[in-house]
Amino acid sequence: LPSYAAVSFDATYTAMGDDNAAHSDAQEILSKAKAIADEQGVEATTLIVTGDPASVFVELSRNYNLIVIGNRGKGGLAERLLGTTSSSLPAYAYCPIVVVPYTDDDGNLMHLNNTITKVAVGSDESKWGLKALEIAANFAAAWDAELDVISAVPNMKGSDDEGVMASFKDDLEVRIKPLEEAHPDLKINKQIVPGPAVGALTKASYDHDVVVVGSRGRGGFTGLLLG
């Protein structure tokens, strides 16, 4: 489902220009996407929507169980639009979001596996973190994959760092216990790491097939960022 809009490089909207050409390009993208779905035996319907991609997908997320987007385009305007969408959509969507990387930080094409063997999830005591943990466990169990639960401890310079780490470990054990009972065959690895969560999860993305985090979004649990 391609959504297109005219955006200048200073992030202001400009005239759309040749609507027919834009529509034709979008239709070509849809035809290729549907062909891929057909090859996999997946029933697919197509739709072209005119508008800002992020806004369009936020509205569509009201009526879908899952939305999948890329986080890098092929450069230029396409990259700007997809980058903006992948950054803003998870925070405002009404359903879980899967964000699929196109390239790594060095611009190399990503190799995406069709088999999921390792799943990571960022976990804290918030209701969003607990929901992310639940969904990650269900997802990992469905794929018969390992689940790495990561709890980040902010950098501290006090004298009781060991006590704080022990407290985080105890809290993580409490959060994981219901998952172990619900999925007795699921291999769950627990990681307590110092520093910001974003660093730990970014590192995890290099050797995991899926990373799950919660999103506070609209003041409640409104979406997940998967990717």
Q: Model-predicted segments: where are they?
A:
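Structural beta-alpha unit
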Residues: 5, 13-20, 35-67, 180-221
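Small/aliphatic-rich secondary-structure junction motif
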Residues: 1-20, 40-45, 115-162, 166, ...
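Active-site phosphate/pyrophosphate- and oxyanion-stabilizing loops and adjacent acidic/basic residues
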Residues: 55, 87, 137, 177, ...
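Short, solvent-exposed amphipathic alpha-helices that sit
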Residues: 22-33, 56, 135, 167-175
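Intrinsically disordered, low-complexity Ser/Thr-rich linker and spacer segments
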Residues: 105-117
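Short, conserved glycine- and acidic-residue-centered signature motifs
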Residues: 26, 82-86, 112, 129, ...
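Gly/Ser-rich helix-loop-strand patches that form or flank binding pockets
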Residues: 54-108, 205-227
